[in-house]
Amino acid sequence: MNHPGLFLFLGLTFAVQLLLLVFLLFFFLVWWDQFGCRCDGFIL
């Protein structure tokens, strides 16, 4: 039995987790660029 509400809830939870992961990665990259060691040979 497929419940559309449960599927929507799982989809929203996955989307929120993905957004949080991307935000944390972006914040880490900005923090690393400002306060971390800046290597000229490091290319993302």
Swiss-Prot record:
Belongs to the papillomaviridae E5 protein family. It comes from Reindeer papillomavirus (RPV). It holds the Pfam family EPV_E5. This is Protein E5. Keywords: Early protein. InterPro entries: EPV_E5 (IPR012555). The lineage of its organism: Viruses, Monodnaviria, Shotokuvirae, Cossaviricota, Papovaviricetes.
